[in-house]
Structures are given as C-alpha cells and as structure tokens.
Amino acid sequence: MFEINPVKNRIQDLSERSAVLRGYLDYDAKKERLEEVNAELEQPDVWNEPERAQALGKERSSLEAIVDTIDQLTQGLEDVAGLLELAVEEDDEDTFNDTTVELDALENKLGQLEFRRMFSGQYDSADCYLDIQAGSGGTEAQDWASMLVRMYLRWAEAKGFKTEIIEESDGDVAGTKSATIKIIGDYAFGWLRTETGVHRLVRKSPFDSGGRRHTSFSSAFVYPEVEDDIDIEINPADLRIDVYRASGAGGQHVNRTESAVRITHMPTGIVTQCQNDRSQHKNKDQAMKQLKAKLYEFEMQKKNAEKQAMEDNKSDIGWGSQIRSYVLDDSRIKDLRTGVETRNTQAVLDGDLDKFIEASLKAGL
C-alpha cells in the first residue's frame, strides 16, 4: 500500500499557491483582455495598421503566457486528483507513481509563473539591448568579449527569445571589441537587468606562447527598449479652465464677452491659452490642442531623461563593478554578489545562466 496523504497535501498546497497567483496576476481581467485582443486580431483590416497589429500580437503572447499556464495548472491539478483516486481504487502503484510525476511537472510550471512576480519593474516586460565592451588587455580581452556575446546568444536561444546583432566591432587579431545585441521576447529586460556589470576571466591564454595565466575584463550593460509612441490622455479632473475677456486686436466684440480661454494642467503646471477667436468653444478647442502638444513634448523630455540616465549609468560601470568571476583553470565560476558558484564552466559559457540570474533577482539586486 502506498502513502496517499503526502500526495494529497501536495495537491492542496499547489492548489492554494495557484489560487494566490491567480489573484495576484489578475487572471480574470487578463482572460477578458485576451478575448478582446483575439477579436481585434481576427478583424480583416487589422494589418492596415502594422505597428498596432504587431503590438496586439505581442500583447497576446504575454497574456497567453499567464492565462494558458493558469488554465493548465487548474486542469492539471483536477486531473492529478482524479488519477490519485483511480490509483487508490485499483491499488495500482504505477498509476500512483504517475501522479507524483505529474505533480512534479505542475510544480515546476507553477514555480516558473511565481517567478514572474519578480518582474515588477516599469520596463521589466520590455525587449532589451545588451552592450558588450572589451576591457583593456588587447586580444585576450577582446576574445573574452566574443565569448560573452556567444554565451548570451546561447542563453537567449534557450529561453526562446529572438536576437539581433545590432552592431559588432571585430577585435584587432581575434574576438570582439564591442557588440550590441537586441533581445526580443516577454520580460527580456526583466531577466537580464541584473547582468549589468564587469565580468572577469582568468585562464591560461591561448594567445600567449608561454601559456601563462591572464586576467581579462569585459563589461555588460543591459537597458530596455523604450517605446517612442506616447499616448496622451488628459483627465478632465486634472484641468482648471478659466475664461476671461480677450484683450488686444480682435474686432468689435473682443472685450464684450468672455471668449478667451486659459487651461491649466494641474499635475504638471503646464498652461495654455487662446483668445484669437470670438467663439469660446473654438478657443477652448485650440487651447486643448496646444495642451496635448505640450504634454507630448513633456513626456518626450521625460523619456529622453530616462534614456540619458541609462547612458549615465552605463558610464558609471567601472572595472571595479565586478559581478562574476570565471576562473577556467580552477573550473569555477562565482557570482560575487550572491555567492552562487558552479564548477561546470563549459555549461555556463554555453548559456546556462539561470542559476545566477534567478539568485540575483531573488536577492533584489
């Protein structure tokens, strides 16, 4: 006879965790939105606006990743509970063993979805760019930079992300002086944002005829793709609208009616005014157009300031900002921030980075 209580407890635990996640991720709203997006994408004229169609396609993928996974968890847990009942009724150990295998798979799926809660930053869901820059040290450092490029490309491929090499400058003899890679996929920036920093390599250099040990540095800098399309929505509650008598030229009625309009956008302090028409309605429309234009420029300046802050942060990465050490002679790679290390150096250089990335995200770096 097999022990069923531990399995029942696991089913209960996974059901409770799944219910918490369902609420946290706002499953009902996302499911409703997914239906709306699917309906829009089924419209025959959707590709008349390619950019909007692409944005909808991306939104659908993001929504499906959550909705479909929660649906699979819900159905999977029901199926496992039924399988357990069958195993008990028929006293079938093989069927019982199947329940534990299924539970392991469901727990893994749930764990991956729970991990998404780490991605709460403003740009975590965005595509991103990864800059790799060789440090001083000539060919050895440039070869190390090319190894990092390969490592991140392999990691992205394993994650199912698409990649584009935006720019790559070859090294003098071998390797890469610098490269920029665009990584496209859900939460690309969220996954990679803690990889910014200096990567240190220690090995016997293949470029040294004496086979001596060399230390090389290359930096990685990760930054999100910030969309330039800014949708200006104005909340009427944020506006103070004053009307007053126009002054100056404007005809015989200019000072007889309060046709001039001044609009103040209280959250930003932006003010627009118009008095060039005798109609208060037309003056108000014109002032609103000006306000939208000013708010658009205001938002653009904010975006540019954010981009500049990212660039400033990039220049702050000094060679002392080491995040990971790769000592190939000793078969040891260690993250200097979290203490996570491994001796399977080749696997890491082939893109097996998740243990380091997950630890840094959980540490809130």
Curated annotation (Swiss-Prot):
The modification N5-methylglutamine is found at residue 252. Peptide chain release factor 2 directs the termination of translation in response to the peptide chain termination codons UGA and UAA. The lineage of its organism: Bacteria, Pseudomonadati, Pseudomonadota, Gammaproteobacteria, Enterobacterales. It comes from Pectobacterium carotovorum subsp. carotovorum (strain PC1). It comes from the Bacteria. GO terms for cellular component: cytoplasm. InterPro entries: PCRF, Pep_chain_release_fac_I, Pep_chain_release_fac_I_sf, PrfB. Belongs to the prokaryotic/mitochondrial release factor family. The gene is prfB. This is Peptide chain release factor 2. It holds the Pfam family PCRF. SUPFAM superfamilies: Release factor. Keywords: Cytoplasm, Methylation, Protein biosynthesis. GO terms for molecular function: translation release factor activity, codon specific.
